[in-house]
Amino acid sequence: TACVAIEIDTPGKPFFRQERIGKNGKPIYIFKLRTMVSDAHEHPEKYMTSEQLAQWKREQKVDDDPRITRVGRFLRRTSLDELPQFINVLMGDLSVIGPRPVTLEETYEYGDARDEVLSCKPGITGWWAATDRNDSTWASGQRQARELFYVRHQSVGLDARVFVKTFKAMRKGK
């Protein structure tokens, strides 16, 4: 039903595939339900103001991103857009819990910790995503710190905390 809603809301395929960097720097493709207009990544200037474009270049995030569709807002708020990533788990590219998979450009945001973070299999959710994914940015350094915290403290107990926090965030729509 989500696929039908996406196709009714805006033209284009309901699934989105993007290259990210997996464990040990291996390129992988992650799957998601499309939450933006179809040409959002190819032509962001069609949809964003100059201020929004500057924020995107700085933080890889935009407040009230105009490229996100109505259905996309709901899918993101409930994290339902991430469900297709279980295909990536079955393929062995992702784990359920780990640092979020990032683009090649974003890997450099980790600085000297880049190889350490990439030594861990990325996950559908993780410490950063579960604690404050909507409240921190690369520019603040908080995202890097939270992802590195997970890599350095991996345990069944921490995974359980991430799972519970993720579930609570999904219920609250954060």
Which stretches of residues belong to each language-model region?
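Short, glycine-rich, amphipathic interfacial segments at transmembrane boundaries or analogous
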Residues: F16-P66, T125-R146
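Hydrophobic structural segments characteristic of membrane proteins
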Residues: A5, L83-K174
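A hydrophobic, helix-centered structural microdomain
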Residues: T1-E42, N88, V156-K174
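Alpha-solenoid HEAT/Armadillo repeat architecture
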Residues: K61, R76, F149-Y150
